Amino acid sequence: MKILSLESSAGPASVVFAEDGRIRAAQYQDVGSTHSRTLLPLCESMLSNAGLSYADADLIAVSAGPGSFTGVRIGIATAKGIAFGTGAKCLAVSSLLGLAANCADLEGMLLCPCVDARCGRVYTALFRVENGFPRRLAEDQILPISALADFCAEPPMLLGDAAEAALAALPGARLAPLALRTHHAVGIARAAEHFAADAVESDLLVPVYLQKSQAEQTRLDAEKKN
């Protein structure tokens, strides 16, 4: 299967074209640019340099959150646009599973992705690498960093942009190498290979936020006061 995967749920933006488990092309950028300006050009540059086209992809896999509200929306919209033009199906992949899949070679390791959810909280989950793939132990959720010690049954390896902040709350935990704890479309592609049967038509692709955006929460708070 040929998979075009997109990751824009956090600071970096990356794209990967994978075929039958092999990465044929990839591009990554983390220079603070708005994903709306970078994600599609990254795709087009990668495909052009590799002699590929959007039509070559059987599946469009995208990081559907949790993470940056804007980044997730941009990724979903980009995936839908590509799929609409090619007829390919889409797959929403948890950004936390994507992080864990970066570490699929660390057999037996307990993995705890921690992505900044603001206000001293993180988006998190738990995975154990078994037979070369992270098996989910806990669903994606929001927790205060202070609650992570109770959440983890044993010291885990930490991933994600809040991994360093979480380290102080988890005695015995350790950071994954930077290249493995950073959001990358390689992890999205790896996860997509395992869950390709769950692919849907592009109009059914939806983001996963886990909480309201700051703007939405502010509006709701104002409505309650009125």
Tell where the protein language model's regions lie, with residue ranges.
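Phosphate-handling active-site elements
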Residues: S48-A55, F84-V93, D105, M109, ...
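N-terminal beta-alpha supersecondary unit
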Residues: M1-A64
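A glycine- and small-aliphatic-rich helix-loop capping segment at beta-alpha/alpha-beta transitions
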Residues: E19-I23, I76-T86, V129-N131
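Surface "functional belts" at beta-alpha junctions
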Residues: R22, Y28, T34, K89-H183, ...
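Gly/Ser/Thr-rich beta-alpha loop segments that engage phosphate groups in nucleotides
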Residues: A13, T34, G65-F69, R73, ...
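DPxDG-like acidic metal-binding loop motif
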Residues: L59-K89, S95
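Acyltransferase
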Residues: P134, P177-N226
